[in-house]
Amino acid sequence: MASQTGQKIRLVRCPKCLKILQEDEDVPVYQCGGCSAILQAKRRNIAPSSTPSAGETERAQANEPQSVPETNNVSSSSGQDTVLPSSPGRSVDQEYEKGRNASMESTEKELDDLELSNGDGTNEIQEQECSLGDSEKNEREDNSRLESHMMNTVAEAAGSGSSSGSLSVDHVVAARASNPSGNSEISPDASPVEEKQSQLDILANKTPSAYDVVAARASNSSGNAEISPDASPVEEKQSQLDYPANKTSSAYDGSESSSDEREGQLLDDDEQWNALQKIRSGKFEMHRYPGYKEQGASSSSPFSENRRNGITTYNERHQNRSLQLEGPGGRLGRQGRRHVTEQLRPDMPFYPRESYTRGSPSHPSHDEFDRYPRAHSLQMPSYAGGMNHDFVDYMYHNNPRARGQGQGSRISGEMGRNHGGWYSGQLHNSYSSYSASPQRPMEQPEYHPRWRREIVSDVEDHQRNRHAGHHHELQTRRLRERQRVAKRHVRPTAGGAPFVSCYSCSENLQLPVDFLIFKRKHHLLRCGTCTTVLRFSLQSRNHLVPAVTHDINANRNSNSTSESPIDKAPSKPEKLRSSVQDEELPVARGSPLHRLMGYSTVSQVFKVSQRPPSI
C-alpha cells in the first residue's frame, strides 16, 4: 500500500510485545509505542526479475510430453491464415490475476485499518491470518488445476498445429493480446514449446500475493515475524533462519531489533578504535532523553522524525556500532560480544534495560543471563580482555593473601546480592590482587569503588555470630558461677581507719568494734603473727594511744621494791588494786547504739550537748 506522501508502509509486529506497528520505508530505526523497545527496520531489497537459468530450462524440458519435440520445426507462412484459437487457460489466468489483485488490495486495506491496541489488534490479525490461510489453500488448489489445464491446452494446440502444418503471426498476436499480464514477449517464430516455457517462467518469477505471505507468517509458531507483502520467498526463508528463536541469546544482547541483516556489516579499524575509546572515556549522555520510557501511545518516536530531517543522535550511532560489532561476521568473537555490549551501554548504575525476549517460551532464562553481566560491568573494573570465572578462581586459590583475612579488599555491598553466579568468598578475596594482575593495563587508573564496605561471606558471618554468641554465654555463666562474697563494712574507729600496726612485727591489725562500746581505760589486742599483746587507750574517745607508760612505771616500781623490801609489801596491793580498777567493766548506761555514737544517755541525744559524754 502507499501513503499520502508516496512512501511505502509495511506492517510489522514487535518481537517483544507482539504489537502491530507501521514501518516506513525511509525510517531505519524506530521505537515501539507499547513496550518502548527500539527496533531496526528490515532493509528492503527488491528482487530483480531474473532470466530463466539453464537449470530451469532443462527442468522445463524434462517435464514436457514426448509428443512436443515433433513440432519443433513449425514455421509461420504468410499465405495461410490459420488462426490459433485462444486457449481458455489464458482468459482464466487473466481473471485469476484480476481476482488476486482485488483480494490483495482488500487485504491490504483491512490490514491498514487494524487498531494498534495490544488485545484487539492481536486477536483480529490472528483471525485474519487463519482466514487467509484457508483462502491460500483454496488458491493453491486453483493454481494446480489451472496449470494442469494449461498444460493440456498447450499439448492440444501443439497437436492441432502439427496436423494443420504451420502457425501464423496472427495466432501469436491473439495469444499475446489474451495475456496482458505476461512479462516475456513471444516472438513470431516461437513454437508452442517455447510459449509454454515462457508461461512457466512467468509463474516462477511472479511476486507472491499477500495471501501467500500472511499464510507463511501464520505457519510460524512464535508469531513474532513481520508481515511484508513485498518480500520474496528467499527473504522469507532468510528471515525465518535469522529469527531470534532459532539463534542464541548472546547475539541479541546489544540492542533490540526486528531484523539482523545489519550484523554482517563491519567497522573499519579506525572506527572500532574510536568507539572503544569513547566507551572508556564515558561520554554517554542519558540526560538528553529523560522521557525514554514515557513515549508510548504511538507507533513511531522522535527517532524516525530525526532520521527524516537528517539528524542522527549520539545514542543512535552507538546503537548501530553495537550492532556491527556484535554481528556474526564482526571483528569481535563470541567471548567479547557481551563485554563490548555492556561497555556500549551508558555507565550509570541500575541502567533501566529489559530483556529482549521476556515472556517468550523459547528464552526462559534470558533475564538471569542479562543481570549477571550488568552487575559485573557496574561493580568490577573494565578490562581490555575481559575477566572470566576461571581467572577469579585461579587468583583465589593461588594467592596466599586472598585466603587470609582479606584486609584492604573492599568492594560494593550490592555485588554479592546481585551477582548470583559467584559466591561471596571469591569476590571478597579476589579483589586484593587486582593491582598485581597481568590483565590490568598499566595506563588505566586505579579502581576505587564508590561503596566502602567490606564484603564477608555468609559462612564467615555465621561463624562470627556463633563465636560471639558463645563468648557471651561463657561470660554470663562465669558471672553466675562466681561465688558470692559476704560484704564487710569497715567503720571508722576513734576518728580514723580501724587499722594499726604491730609494734614488734609491723603486721597490719584491724581494731574490733567493741573498742568504742566498752568503756575501759585500756584495751588489749593480741597480734595473730607474733602473739604479742598490745594495749591501747582512748583519749576523749577520738584518739587511740598505745599504753606503754604503764609498763615503764611498772618496771620502775619493781626496781624500787627490790631496793627497799620493807616498802614492797604495802605497794603491791595498791598496784593490784589499781589494775583491778582499770579492768572493771563500767556500768552500762543507755543503749549500745547511743554509746557507739558517742552518747551515754537518751537525754544527750535530745539536748544535743556539746560536752563529750562522761567516761
UniProtKB/Swiss-Prot annotation:
InterPro entries: EDR4-like, EDR4-like_N, Zinc_ribbon_12. Transmembrane segments: none annotated. Residues 134-148, 565-577 have a biased composition (Basic and acidic residues). One of its GO terms (biological process) is response to fungus. Residues 63-89, 119-129, 296-314, 552-564 have a biased composition (Polar residues). The keyword Cytoplasm does not apply. Expressed in stems and rosette leaves, and weakly in inflorescences. Not detected in roots. It is found in: Cell membrane; Endosome. One of its GO terms (cellular component) is endosome. Residues 104-129 form a coiled coil. Residues 159-168 have a biased composition (Low complexity). The keyword Iron-sulfur does not apply. Keywords: Cell membrane, Coiled coil, Endocytosis, Endosome, Membrane, Plant defense. Induction: Rapid but transient induction by wounding, salicylic acid treatment or pathogen infection. Accumulates at the penetration site of powdery mildew (e.g. G.cichoracearum) infection. Disruption phenotype: Mild, hypersensitive response-like lesions under long-day conditions at late growth stages. Enhanced salicylic acid (SA) accumulation and SA signaling-dependent disease resistance to Golovinomyces cichoracearum UCSC1 associated with enhanced H(2)O(2) accumulation and callose deposition in the infection site as well as higher expression of defense-related genes (PRs). Reduced endocytosis rates. Signal peptide: none annotated. Residues 46-271, 292-336, 549-592 are annotated as: Disordered. PANTHER family: EXTRA-LARGE G-PROTEIN-LIKE (PTHR31105), PROTEIN ENHANCED DISEASE RESISTANCE 4 (PTHR31105:SF38). Interacts with RLK902. Binds and recruits EDR1 at the powdery mildew (e.g. G.cichoracearum) penetration site on the plasma membrane. Interacts with CHC2. Plays a negative role in salicylic acid (SA)-mediated resistance to powdery mildew (e.g. Golovinomyces cichoracearum). May modulate plant immunity by regulating the relocation of EDR1 by interacting with CHC2 and modulating endocytosis. This is Protein ENHANCED DISEASE RESISTANCE 4. It comes from Arabidopsis thaliana.
